[in-house]
């Protein structure tokens, strides 16, 4: 079957032929309909330091998808051929302390679809039954294939109370923008979005941000809020500047959730900015399985167009490189690939 591959340890991805996966007794084979291109796929394409240290070619990439169950292993009971499904891309070991206490999203032995195991940028993908998610009929394919990034946003937002809160969002990439939509629908009192790029700030307005700023200026944020700073900070960028400025913009007793991944060491004034202010800080990794998925489904059933403005490019799968280049030059937010015509 045709697939998008990291065929060799170098810059780029290519179309190539790979075998259709065979499901084991507890696996589900899914005929892929739509996929989303993630920033992780871009890192693999660009073969940066992270990718070259983690990825072992040849590898089918991709982890955001929706499709139809084609076949199941003999022990599978929860789905059958013809069911419309997506899937959780973090495959926990099932045996460690985290997995056995409902925290498989932080399993130390996790395998990630399209990173550690063969991914979904192909006509077929195979996942354990325990990772499969039946998609509600009310949710369209283009949005259903984005449950992975939407789930990251949902997990970050729902890690603390947000109803009636004044929230600072640092970074308006796709996940930050999704978080703004969730905050708006979830009853946040004020959403202040920060991003250095004008087109992202415009999208933040579209998603419902009350105020958009080029940088997290302490005096500006404190003037906008009536509580001497934001109640909640969601850090989605991993930017050194954003983190250092953001901690100055929150009130004492604020909640801070960190999803963005820094690529350098960042000095924080821990005593003045964190300890004496009594902040509660949470690290966010992936989606809680499957609490976050239920929350995503509920939101998208009731707010069917919530993330529609963020899908800027819809392309056939064989034009994937066009989508990645659009992400690189900043013209794309979310790119959805159609696998309808892929050859098997």
Predicted regions and their residues:
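N-terminal glycine-rich cofactor-binding segment
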Residues: 3-22, 39-71, 86, 107-118
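Glycine-rich beta-strand-centered segment in the early N-terminal region that forms part
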Residues: 21-35, 50-97, 136-138
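NAD(P)H dinucleotide-binding glycine-rich loop of Rossmann-like/cofactor-binding domains
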Residues: 54, 93-170
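Mid-domain Rossmann-like dinucleotide-binding core that forms the NAD(H)/NADP(H) cofactor-binding site
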Residues: 137-217
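Glycine-rich cofactor phosphate-binding loops and adjacent beta1-alpha1 units
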Residues: 160-163, 202-280, 321, 343-344
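Residues in the short beta-alpha loop(s) of Rossmann-like NAD(P)-binding domains
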Residues: 197, 262, 287
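C-terminal substrate-binding/catalytic core of Rossmann-like NAD(P)-dependent dehydrogenases/reductases
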Residues: 223, 227, 265-313, 321-322, ...
